[in-house]
Amino acid sequence: MDTKHLIASEIQKVVPDMEQSTILSLLETPKNSSMGDLAFPAFSLAKTLRKAPQIIASDIAEQIKSDQFEKVEAVGPYVNFFLDKAAISSQVLKQVLSDGSAYATQNIGEGRNVAIDMSSPNIAKPFSIGHLRSTVIGDSLANIFDKIGYHPVKINHLGDWGKQFGMLIVAYKKWGNEEAVRAHPIDELLKLYVRINAEAETDPSVDEEAREWFRKLEANDPEATELWQWFRDESLLEFNRLYDKMNVTFDSYNGEAFYNDKMEEVLELLESKNLLVESKGAQVVNLEKYGIEHPALIKKSDGATLYITRDLAAALYRRRTYDFAKSIYVVGNEQSAHFKQLKAVLKEMDYDWSDDMTHVPFGLVTKGGAKLSTRKGNVILLEPTVAEAINRAASQIEAKNPNLADKDKVAQAVGVGAIKFYDLKTDRTNGYDFDLEAMVSFEGETGPYVQYAHARIQSILRKANFNPSNSDNYSLNDVESWEIIKLIQDFPRIIVRAADNFEPSIIAKFAINLAQCFNKYYAHTRILDEDAEISSRLALCYATATVLKESLRLLGVDAPNEM
């Protein structure tokens, strides 16, 4: 329990009618440390208790008895709490040394499923930086929910259906070279895709031809189906090579095509519930009562179903298959209106579980301030970017530690971790400008900075030949170690806050803060001096390294023991 919750629970014992959340919101940090570590103003209780705030403060101070406080005193209308830093430090360190990497594990989810729709790149297009965000945010959220007792189900809803396959088939039949595509599938398919889109801008017949090929694909035409399957298989091989490098796995690759035979049921359900309305020859669901101006377009006048129909089928399938407690869609900000419609249609269908569905939007990645677009060929491809990040990490490691064992393995952990961390430290709904040099830097608020702090601590522990024991009586009460203790104590609450807000950046910022606090401590403390407090200082080092490593793991980032 962190110090604020400790104080709130002690106050609540004295004033049981006051909600703990209210007490927490009222706690203040005094400007002057001589007035305690935290203070509670008693003004809000004056009306209910019909006493002066000064008397209430005095009553509360007298009744609180806990060995976690050096003293509790009333000063005017305030109750000032002076924490027993040595006692709390000892308690926190013993807990981390006992639990190890399981520290801060919780069972809030009780094993229930969380379906996470994430990554979802388009088949036959390269895996770009644009897909990085959905991949790493989704992967981190899976780790975070797992840590608090849920069972994450990671779903890669592949973009493996749609008119773009008509375009691709037209392009391949016009200019395609089977040998070239087999040798470099994604590169060649991208060239074809960009070329056919450029031609379509000046020649309207290209669009019509693409629509015709897509109609054939929908009708299971053998030639169209064979080409589609080939494009899909080749793309997936390439994607999986990248996922392996990024250390990301999935529980399902059911993409858009998987739901082709499941949309008829959606239409039947909507009809049976009298929700479909005709509008200009199309079938729609009106959603005005949900404050949504535009109706959900379910079926076009030519009989073609739409993206939302497929997502309705997917939502029904996932509910039946996974019986989820939460269903999360990690998809860009630009899809917000679509997901509002999706939830509203399910609500209209009387599916209360639609309340458990959440769109987790994120901002754009730009380059030099410009938006990226595969169609226009203005794109940062992930594979060469990861390779470049690993090379830059390798150069820095060579300069810092030329005799390091497993240099290639460490460079991969640092390079890949740098890209992931930079993405995840950004508030999810904000975008960021892609800057590889800033990402891989060992200075500043970066992944390598946090990894290096962890490796530095491991070096100290090796020198000291430290073996963790939770039976020793650890005691620290200096200012800098206390800052670290407070953060470590707060870690369980930080994880829950990250889960509640679907916000991995909360963990990333916590890790940066902890690394900075440790580096400050390291600069001012002779950790290995043989004196009465050496075992306490080493226990603090061990606890810090444990929490740093676990923070990074929750972000999908490795923490090498040497760098």
UniProtKB/Swiss-Prot annotation:
GO terms for cellular component: cytoplasm. SUPFAM superfamilies: Anticodon-binding domain of a subclass of class I aminoacyl-tRNA synthetases (SSF47323), Arginyl-tRNA synthetase (ArgRS), N-terminal 'additional' domain (SSF55190), Nucleotidylyl transferase (SSF52374). It comes from the Bacteria. InterPro entries: Arg-tRNA-ligase, Arg-tRNA-synth_N, Arg-tRNA-synth_N_sf, ArgRS_core, DALR_anticod-bd, Rossmann-like_a/b/a_fold, tRNAsynth_Ia_anticodon-bd. It is an enzyme of class 6 (ligase). Its EC number is 6.1.1.19. This is Arginine--tRNA ligase. The gene is argS.
